[in-house]
Structures are given as C-alpha cells and as structure tokens.
Amino acid sequence: KDGYPVDSKGCKLSCVANNYCDNQCKMKKASGGHCYAMSCYCEGLPENAKVSDSATNIC
C-alpha cells in the first residue's frame, strides 16, 4: 500500500529531502518514497504497515 508512514507516536515523518524519505521508506519495507508536503510518502508498503489517517491524526 501507499501512504505516509508514522513514527512510534503516530506522527508523520517530517522531511525536506527525497533521499531521506526513500531510505526511511525502504527501512519500513516499502519499494521507495519521497518528500511530499513536508512529510515522507512511501510507495509499496506492506499491507500491515501503519500509515497516517487524517481521521485519527493527533499530531
């Protein structure tokens, strides 16, 4: 699945550079990622990966 991965507090990973996000996403077993709207966006995450949900976002 695709989406904005979250940290242990449930917050999106903030970013300014695409290479940072690509590395962070790959560590979460995604195919890759990029920085979009100041947050990391991952593509190809496992289905069980936790991603940001605007309905429950508390950050």
Swiss-Prot record:
Molecular function per GO: sodium channel inhibitor activity; toxin activity
Annotated disulfide bonds: C11-C59, C15-C35, C21-C40, C25-C42
Protein name per its UniProtKB record: Alpha-like toxin CsEv5
Gene Ontology terms describing biological process: defense response
SMART domains in the cross-refs: Knot1 (SM00505)
Main localization (coarse): secreted
Gene3D superfamilies: Knottin, scorpion toxin-like
An annotated GO cellular component: extracellular region
Domain notes: Has the structural arrangement of an alpha-helix connected to antiparallel beta-sheets by disulfide bonds (CS-alpha/beta).
Keywords tagged on the record: Disulfide bond, Ion channel impairing toxin, Neurotoxin, Secreted, Toxin, Voltage-gated sodium channel impairing toxin
InterPro entries: LCN-type_CS_alpha_beta_dom, Scorpion_toxin-like, Scorpion_toxin-like_sf, Scorpion_toxinL, Scorpion_toxinL/defensin
UniProt family annotation: Belongs to the long (4 C-C) scorpion toxin superfamily. Sodium channel inhibitor family.
SUPFAM superfamilies: Scorpion toxin-like (SSF57095)
Tissues/organs with expression: Expressed by the venom gland.
One Pfam family this sequence matches: Toxin_3
Function: Binds voltage-independently sodium channels (Nav) and inhibits the inactivation of the activated channels, thereby blocking neuronal transmission. Is highly toxic to insects and barely toxic to mammals. As it does not compete with the classical alpha-toxin AaH2, this toxin is considered as an alpha-like toxin.
Cell location: Secreted
LCN-type CS-alpha/beta domain: residues covered: 1-59
